[in-house]
Amino acid sequence: MDKLLAWSVKQQQEGTNEPPPDPKLLAQLFGAPDDAQLMVQAMVVITQPDNKLEDKEVAFDNFEMLVENLDNANMMKNLKLWEPLLAQLSSPHPSLQKLAAWVVATATQNNPKSQEALVEQGDAGIKKLVDLTSHDDPEVVVKSLFALASAIRNCDDAYKLFESADGLKKVVGHLKPDATAQVKSKTLGVLTGILESETDLMKPEEKRQVFDILVKELETDDHIPSLERSLHVLVLLNQKGFPFTPEETEQVKKAAKRVEGKLDEEDVKYNEDLKYVNNL
């Protein structure tokens, strides 16, 4: 209160242009709830059985926006919010399952503390997300893939849980001709996250499986972003110690030519993956 009074006095003095007081301090001063309280309140709305589905969805949207802040995401552990959040992955309502997966993705993205907090939840987290990649609702599948990509990147403990849930086999299964562009994109995002991790996580036989599938995809897929991402994964495989035979090198170069033919001249000029393949 003293700081607020001092600021008010200075503002009234001629020629003074003091910066306004911290909005968070003002909020606390006048009794507005802080982010921790808002997160808890949102989760109460989400978990109350009698609340309308629409109200729960709005609360989830608010919760997701709050955990975009790294500090807020890391508060989830102390606030004991991980357990009720992950319970929503088993909700009978696909919209709540989707939103829960989205929050996991947001909270763990480039956030080692939240990744470890998720790992501590065991099968309720990673394994359940792997299971949801087989959901009938494509939006649940997309958000679950997004969550897995965020959760396992550069987190060996999360990858171990992913591996024990047979995650790679289930995720790679989405790389098929009839999969939507969005599902393919998120699937390739998971593979990219694994291969760009500092630790070489994939086993040789798993790399072989991914290579064989992607080479076929590059022959038939016409979605430019998917083509570019598929080629990037092939490059990452090679960089992570998966050697191409002369025949496979020709396959990759053929795929790269197909990608090149879909891009404009400027994109080709700055595409590092095309440069890499040309130098094989």
UniProtKB/Swiss-Prot annotation:
<feature type="repeat" description="ARM 2">
    <location>
        <begin position="70"/>
        <end position="109"/>
    </location>
</feature>
<dbReference type="InterPro" id="IPR013918">
    <property type="entry name" value="Nucleotide_exch_fac_Fes1"/>
</dbReference>
<comment type="similarity">
    <text>Belongs to the FES1 family.</text>
</comment>
<dbReference type="GO" id="GO:0000774">
    <property type="term" value="F:adenyl-nucleotide exchange factor activity"/>
</dbReference>
<feature type="repeat" description="ARM 1">
    <location>
        <begin position="10"/>
        <end position="51"/>
    </location>
</feature>
<dbReference type="InterPro" id="IPR050693">
    <property type="entry name" value="Hsp70_NEF-Inhibitors"/>
</dbReference>
<protein>
    <recommendedName>
        <fullName>Hsp70 nucleotide exchange factor FES1</fullName>
    </recommendedName>
</protein>
<keyword id="KW-0963">Cytoplasm</keyword>
<dbReference type="GO" id="GO:0005829">
    <property type="term" value="C:cytosol"/>
</dbReference>
<feature type="repeat" description="ARM 4">
    <location>
        <begin position="156"/>
        <end position="196"/>
    </location>
</feature>
<keyword id="KW-0677">Repeat</keyword>
<dbReference type="GO" id="GO:0035091">
    <property type="term" value="F:phosphatidylinositol binding"/>
</dbReference>
<dbReference type="GO" id="GO:0071629">
    <property type="term" value="P:cytoplasm protein quality control by the ubiquitin-proteasome system"/>
</dbReference>
<dbReference type="InterPro" id="IPR002014">
    <property type="entry name" value="VHS_dom"/>
</dbReference>
<feature type="repeat" description="ARM 5">
    <location>
        <begin position="199"/>
        <end position="239"/>
    </location>
</feature>
<dbReference type="GO" id="GO:0006417">
    <property type="term" value="P:regulation of translation"/>
</dbReference>
<dbReference type="InterPro" id="IPR011989">
    <property type="entry name" value="ARM-like"/>
</dbReference>
<feature type="repeat" description="ARM 3">
    <location>
        <begin position="112"/>
        <end position="153"/>
    </location>
</feature>
<comment type="function">
    <text>Functions as a nucleotide exchange factor (NEF) for Hsp70 chaperones which accelerates the release of ADP. Required for fully efficient Hsp70-mediated folding of proteins.</text>
</comment>
<dbReference type="InterPro" id="IPR000225">
    <property type="entry name" value="Armadillo"/>
</dbReference>
<dbReference type="GO" id="GO:0043130">
    <property type="term" value="F:ubiquitin binding"/>
</dbReference>
<dbReference type="InterPro" id="IPR016024">
    <property type="entry name" value="ARM-type_fold"/>
</dbReference>
<keyword id="KW-0810">Translation regulation</keyword>
<dbReference type="GO" id="GO:0005783">
    <property type="term" value="C:endoplasmic reticulum"/>
</dbReference>
<dbReference type="Pfam" id="PF08609">
    <property type="entry name" value="Fes1"/>
</dbReference>
